[in-house]
């Protein structure tokens, strides 16, 4: 069959590369990176580390959310399928640096991603684009530098939800826990006609005051505004029906 013939041909190529000490390049897709053992171990270890440090969930579920939100944003604004795929790959990998250290995790993640991506059949330009997006996603050291990084930033910083709070007694919640737990509803809406990206939050003010929310998230929301500007759009934030940003 055709499939059997392709398998035999692939095996011959691998054997040839082993004999001649040449690298076997693997075509890359979002599906592939989601099933990359090294990437998933880094995400698992990073999430464990952050759990011990008291941070909210940064598991694969968060990374999938970021990847798919970034892709949705670019798709709505008619970016190419190629750019969308790069954003999904960068979005899924963006937090691998937490396995090394939370501080400068974006830069560590970029360095790790650069080495991991070398085993795939990616152009140098695409690899650098992904690495740059990962390295610039943290509000303390980065910012949007191109549409891929801009979409990743918005996908990451708008992932505010109750389910990201780890299971623990409510009495032990810190401000980050309270802020996320207080968000009872979150929607990200994209109006392509008006070129507006809107984050709409419903916050239980009995759990967290609006002041506490902005104490934690103001810089992240301002980063989203900068990312939206790069995309040629406007970022708006609404909390409990009132326009905030």
List each model region and its residues.
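Short alpha-helical catalytic segment bearing the HExxH-like zincin motif
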Residues: 87, 91, 108, 134, ...
């Amino acid at each position: 069959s055709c499939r059997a013939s392709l398998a035999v041909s692939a095996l011959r190529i691998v054997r040839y590369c082993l004999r001649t000490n040449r690298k076997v390049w693997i075509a890359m897709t979002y599906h592939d990176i989601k099933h990359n053992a090294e990437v998933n171990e880094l995400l698992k270890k990073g999430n464990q580390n952050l759990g011990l440090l008291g941070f909210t969930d940064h598991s694969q579920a968060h990374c999938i959310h970021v990847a798919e939100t970034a892709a949705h944003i670019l798709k709505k604004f008619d970016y190419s399928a190629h750019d969308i795929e790069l954003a999904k790959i960068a979005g899924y990998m963006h937090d691998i640096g937490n396995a090394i250290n939370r501080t400068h995790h974006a830069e560590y993640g970029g360095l790790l991603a650069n080495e991991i991506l070398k085993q795939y059949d990616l152009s140098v330009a695409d690899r650098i684009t992904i690495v740059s997006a990962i390295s610039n996603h943290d509000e303390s050291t980065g910012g949007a530098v191109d549409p891929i990084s801009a979409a990743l930033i918005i996908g990451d910083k708008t992932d505010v939800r109750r389910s990201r709070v780890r299971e623990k007694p409510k009495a032990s919640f810190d401000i980050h826990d309270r802020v996320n737990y207080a968000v009872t509803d979150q929607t990200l809406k994209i109006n392509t006609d008006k070129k507006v990206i809107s984050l709409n939050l419903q916050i239980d003010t009995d759990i967290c005051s609006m002041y506490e929310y902005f104490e934690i998230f103001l810089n992240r929301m301002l980063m989203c505004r900068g990312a939206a500007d790069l995309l040629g759009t406007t970022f708006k934030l609404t909390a409990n029906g009132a326009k905030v940003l």
